[in-house]
Amino acid sequence: MPSHHTLLETETLASSKLADAKIDVAAMHAVSSIHRAANASRNHMTNTVLRPHELSWTGFVVLWSVWIYGEPETREVAESAGISKATLSGVVKTLSARGCLKRTQSSSDKRFAHLSLTPAGMTLMEELFPQFNSGEQQLVADLTPDELTVLTKALRKVVTTAEGLGAHTSV
């Protein structure tokens, strides 16, 4: 559900509220826009693509991580999804009960476990991801190819900077 204030209204209100503060308004607007775009994108994808498949955003990200990385350790999936290992445990339980995911104890170290997609999980991802990508295309449809390239490069720099500041550590 979108905010009842537009992005410009929010930025204008924040700038006037903080007019006397020594802040970097451009940085505030940029990071605020990243958050707002991420939330709007996540809500759109959840409502239009994932909900019909009875998947949460977190459930999808866990399935996607396992699909992409093969048979990763649970701690790698938790980090990739940006969730705690405790949260991952609940998500794995739900996805396993649906028959999409399998958890296997490491044979070399019992403290670790690996996740893998079941045949049903593989089928789900192979059917779902093209729909997900269509949603991604909708979200960037108003950008020119050059704008899309510039946006992607700029966001990758922000991610790299955030990770360098320690943002990639476990939740």
What positions do the PLM features span?
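Short capping segments at the starts of secondary-structure elements
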Residues: Y69-E73
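Short, locally clustered residues in the helix-turn-helix/winged-helix DNA-binding domain
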Residues: H35, N39, W64-I68, F129, ...
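Alpha-helical residues within the helix-turn-helix
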Residues: R51, E79, S96-A97
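N-terminal leader segment of winged-helix/HTH proteins
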Residues: M1-H53
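Short alpha-helical "packing" element that flanks the helix-turn-helix/winged-helix DNA-binding module
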Residues: G59-L63
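Charged, amphipathic alpha-helical coiled-coil/dimerization segments
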Residues: K93-K153
